[in-house]
């Protein structure tokens, strides 16, 4: 039976339907791209924060071991001059002190002292001392970092010869500011009443010039560190300092 052409039912899509389908597909594509981009960005931020936390934990481990084992043992420097057991804010370092707990290797034929001298200083991130830190920061996408790196120094012997060189470790790749303070407590002379309350003072420089019968001994140390994107981190340690 012959059916006129104008009576045949159309089976395809209209132009409007095609345009709607294309628009929906495009919207889904844009949404998927944005979602993937957000996931990648979130992962990068998470990885970066994770690296920062790992670095901060490593720093905390080093500093805690160093501070908690401070000992009252002065040294002679490379010029033969006597140096105090604890020094804050001198011309060479932010801080330096003597610490116990530097164990000898059981297979070491030349045993060294088990007391170690450590020191800390910051350098501009573009200085040679911070080269490894800058490379790490660049690998994380921070191409033009501004700030300083924190370096730990330690020596193979306490009383140093003129040619003795310190070994170094980068503790923090990028810091904005570091403040180190020492809490000192007055030591009451024996002939005073036992009810006298010892006086406590915070110092950013040590040793403090002590006069008269009043003598101060270090009882605590505080570090305030300002880190980019994290802010200020504060740590406080009590010192088991034997003033004998």
List PLM regions with ranges:
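Acidic surface patches and DE-rich sequence motifs
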Residues: 9, 77, 227
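Short, mixed-charge, low-aromatic patches
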Residues: 14-24, 74-76, 224, 231
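Extracytoplasmic beta-strand-rich oligomerization domains located immediately C-terminal to a leader/signal peptide
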Residues: 37, 41-161
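Short linear sequence signals and composition-biased patches located at protein termini or domain-edge surfaces
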Residues: 165-244
């Amino acid at each position: 039976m012959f059916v006129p052409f104008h009576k045949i039912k159309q089976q395809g899509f209209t132009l409007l339907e095609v345009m709607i389908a294309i628009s929906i597909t495009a919207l889904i594509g844009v949404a998927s791209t944005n979602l993937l981009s957000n996931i990648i960005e979130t992962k990068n931020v998470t990885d970066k924060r994770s690296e920062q936390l790992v670095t901060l934990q490593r720093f905390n481990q080093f500093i805690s071991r160093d501070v908690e084992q401070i000992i009252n043992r002065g040294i002679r420097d490379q010029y033969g001059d006597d140096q105090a057991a604890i020094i804050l804010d001198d011309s060479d370092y932010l801080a330096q002190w003597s610490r116990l707990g530097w164990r000898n290797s059981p297979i070491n034929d030349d045993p060294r002292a088990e007391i170690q001298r450590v020191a800390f200083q910051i350098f501009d991130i573009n200085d040679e001392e911070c080269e490894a830190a800058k490379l790490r920061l660049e690998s994380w996408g921070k191409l033009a970092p501004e700030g300083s790196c924190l370096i730990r120094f330690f020596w193979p012997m306490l009383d140093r010869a003129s040619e003795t060189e310190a070994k170094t470790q980068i503790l923090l790749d990028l810091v904005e500011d570091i403040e180190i303070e020492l809490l000192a407590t007055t030591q009451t002379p024996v002939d005073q009443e036992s009810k006298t309350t010892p006086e406590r003072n915070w110092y950013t420089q040590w040793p403090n010039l002590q006069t008269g019968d009043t003598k101060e001994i270090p009882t605590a140390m505080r570090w305030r560190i300002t880190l980019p994107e994290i802010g200020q981190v504060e740590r406080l340690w009590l010192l088991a300092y034997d003033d004998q």
